[in-house]
Amino acid sequence: MPVEEVVKVSRNYQVTIPAKVRQKFPVKEGDLVKVIYDENGGVVKIQILDSP
């Protein structure tokens, strides 16, 4: 079941990953993530990379 939240983009084009999403998505401070934009679906995806 998808988890959805609405977030606001800051003036520096930053967004905060909402708590509901973080609970389902094992990301922590310092992790590297890859942001992917799918032009066909107009969807942004986040992929966790190996920690440095």
Swiss-Prot record:
SMART domains cross-referenced by the UniProt entry: SpoVT_AbrB
MF-aspect GO terms: DNA binding
InterPro entries listed in its UniProt record: Repressor-like_regulatory, SpoVT-AbrB_dom, SpoVT-AbrB_sf
SUPFAM superfamilies named among the record's database cross-references: AbrB/MazE/MraZ-like
Keyword DNA-binding: yes
Domain SpoVT-AbrB: 4-51
Domain of life: Archaea
Pfam families per UniProt: MazE_antitoxin
Record flagged with keyword DNA-binding: yes
Keywords, comma-separated and alphabetical: DNA-binding
PROSITE patterns: SPOVT_ABRB (PS51740)
NCBIfam families: lp_hng_hel_AbrB
Protein name: Repressor-like protein SSo7c3
